[in-house]
Amino acid sequence: MNIIRRTVSRQDDWDSSLASLPEPHILQSWVWGEVKSKYGWNAERWIWEENGRATAAAQILERRWPAGLPWPSSRVLYVPRGPILDWSNSALASAVLSDLTSLARERKAIFLKIDPELSLSISEGTDSQPEPSAVGASVEEALRRSSWIPSLEQVQFRSTLRLGLESDEDELLARMKPKTRYNIRLAERKGVSVRSGSESDFDDLYAMYGETSIRDGFVIRPRAYYLDAWGAPLRAGRAKIFLAEVEGRAAAALILFHFGPTAWYFYGMSRSAHRESMPTHLLQWEAIRWAKAAGLRTYDFWGAPDRADPDDPMFGVYRFKAGFGRRGRGVK
């Protein structure tokens, strides 16, 4: 196997190479590296090729350790939702991981963190138990043998719910939980409407996100961060905004990122008012319909508890997302 690695400096080269790989991720896209570059990270992009064809990619984010902590001149390296490659190709995986390890040593990094979208277990259907993934288990064992250490610090969600979009709309509806279908129809009867959004809606989106964070007990970043995190992908054609309105006012919204064959439900927000009209159910369905019409193959609900445990703080989120008929749950 003659694998050549090169550094990429052009957006079109990077995104087209990335899109040709299995399961490319939005967090490995050029625009996401540009977003992070505004917040202390430097993005370096590597492509591995064999016979002139891209076989792997890694967008490596690097930053210096924050001042005032023990190693002020040292660096940390992070490959969000990467590297991207066919993990069943053990020789390729070994070459990619070896190159990344060498980079960390050359830069004298405190650590190098990777979190590839590698399924360790998958469940089919809304109520089935996860089944182990042979490839995931093999890669996990190989990483342990190579002195990689499982991190206790979660950056991205370990688990997610996915919906295949190959079926027609009637079949997608039929696969939903009956209560979810009912709530979609209820929202329509209650006069909820869904429209596309733009940057002119950002102030309203951030206000709703703040209201959601207080109600659900999570912390959000300053407004300026979201102007970049939402605006850059939107301008690059990698994001779509949906707003559900009741009586002419936004009651809920979501921001969908998309790259390659996949859409990700990255951000959701809602007001406490009009929740009885079920705007979030119709909103989600319209986003799914758009993703299908756009030719995407997978809708990723982006985030779920590792186990469907009613005592888990995220169980309510899981139940809402699972109601749309997801077909698999992978633990990364």
Regions found by a protein language model. Give the residues of each.
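Aromatic (often tryptophan-rich) hydrophobic motifs at membrane interfaces
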Residues: 98-99, 227-332
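A conserved beta-strand-loop-helix scaffold within acyl/acetyltransferase catalytic domains
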Residues: 2-69, 116-134, 143-276
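Conserved acetyl-CoA-binding loop of GNAT-fold acetyltransferases
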Residues: 130-153, 314-330
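N-terminal cap/recognition module
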Residues: 70-83
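Short, flexible/disordered intra-domain loops and linkers
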Residues: 90-91, 119-137, 306-313
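Conserved GNAT acetyl-CoA-binding A-motif
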Residues: 106-123, 291-303
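Short secondary-structure subsegments characteristic of cysteine-rich extracellular domains
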Residues: 91-108
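The substrate-binding groove and active-site-proximal loops of carbohydrate-active enzymes
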Residues: 80-88, 129, 275
